[in-house]
Amino acid sequence: MDLLLALLPALFWGSIVLFNVKLGGGPYSQTLGTTIGALIVSIVIYFFVQPVLSLRIFIVGIVSGLFWSLGQANQLKSIQLMGVSKTMPISTGMQLVSTSLFGVIVFREWSTPIAITLGVLALIFIIVGIILTSLEDKNDKKEGEPSNLKKGILILLVSTLGYLVYVVVARLFNVSGWSALLPQAIGMVVGGLVLTYRHKPFNKYAIRNILPGLIWAGGNMFLFISQPRVGVATSFSLSQMGIVISTLGGIFILREKKTKRQLIAIAIGIILIIAAAVFLGIAKTNS
């Protein structure tokens, strides 16, 4: 039961972009709607849990939320260019690499031979996985798709920076869990407004995309509940399984066309990235 509970964040987070695309709108209205949904749930949770809030927690949480908006908005821009099934494995891989390297450099993780071995293997798996999931169809090259791939990856670099700061700022100041949820959601809405207001995001699609925000906050809630039960490392590894849901959802629900060659490459790439997430989770416990 505890493991099933720990899988819920992956189910919730993996389905967010599928809802974003299905509900329609551009990346700006999608971003704004998602942040509003997250804020609604965070306010409700705050009144039930009533976590301790200090000025430090509030400021750090808002800064963290601002950068989450940067990450999410650019991830949705990339999806518009490359599709869900290509964007999400690459995005997940980039996030795992960046947060892992930051952990090693700043927080001195991977301090044991086992952790170093698993960590290096994980990074190799992620890089190979990203290459495989971004494999192009030979026929697409005539239609200018490689330029979309390049643009999409450049946008994902900005997205990864946003997600990295979102995670790292909270960790640097030891702000996490229930206390961070509401301040982060406020920061997300502020960031969403700043990033999107020039693009007239206030429309029916922004309202529709409140639903993915509710789902995102629900995933966070289940992550906080499951961590004490299964441990941070297991919870972290399982939460990365969302890549399976988003990628397969992109192919089978959103009907993104793939050749047999691409499907095989994507399947192998996903397996490698998931294995890397498991290795990183184990490395955390052996540091």
Swiss-Prot record:
<feature type="transmembrane region" description="Helical">
    <location>
        <begin position="180"/>
        <end position="197"/>
    </location>
</feature>
<feature type="transmembrane region" description="Helical">
    <location>
        <begin position="210"/>
        <end position="227"/>
    </location>
</feature>
<keyword id="KW-0749">Sporulation</keyword>
<dbReference type="GO" id="GO:0015144">
    <property type="term" value="F:carbohydrate transmembrane transporter activity"/>
</dbReference>
<keyword id="KW-0472">Membrane</keyword>
<keyword id="KW-0813">Transport</keyword>
<dbReference type="InterPro" id="IPR010651">
    <property type="entry name" value="Sugar_transport"/>
</dbReference>
<feature type="transmembrane region" description="Helical">
    <location>
        <begin position="38"/>
        <end position="60"/>
    </location>
</feature>
<feature type="transmembrane region" description="Helical">
    <location>
        <begin position="232"/>
        <end position="254"/>
    </location>
</feature>
<feature type="transmembrane region" description="Helical">
    <location>
        <begin position="153"/>
        <end position="175"/>
    </location>
</feature>
<feature type="transmembrane region" description="Helical">
    <location>
        <begin position="110"/>
        <end position="132"/>
    </location>
</feature>
<feature type="transmembrane region" description="Helical">
    <location>
        <begin position="4"/>
        <end position="26"/>
    </location>
</feature>
<comment type="function">
    <text>Involved in the uptake of glucose.</text>
</comment>
<protein>
    <recommendedName>
        <fullName>Glucose uptake protein GlcU</fullName>
    </recommendedName>
</protein>
<keyword id="KW-1133">Transmembrane helix</keyword>
<dbReference type="Pfam" id="PF06800">
    <property type="entry name" value="Sugar_transport"/>
</dbReference>
<comment type="similarity">
    <text>Belongs to the GRP transporter (TC 2.A.7.5) family.</text>
</comment>
<dbReference type="GO" id="GO:0005886">
    <property type="term" value="C:plasma membrane"/>
</dbReference>
<keyword id="KW-1003">Cell membrane</keyword>
<feature type="transmembrane region" description="Helical">
    <location>
        <begin position="261"/>
        <end position="283"/>
    </location>
</feature>
<dbReference type="GO" id="GO:0030435">
    <property type="term" value="P:sporulation resulting in formation of a cellular spore"/>
</dbReference>
<keyword id="KW-0762">Sugar transport</keyword>
<keyword id="KW-0812">Transmembrane</keyword>
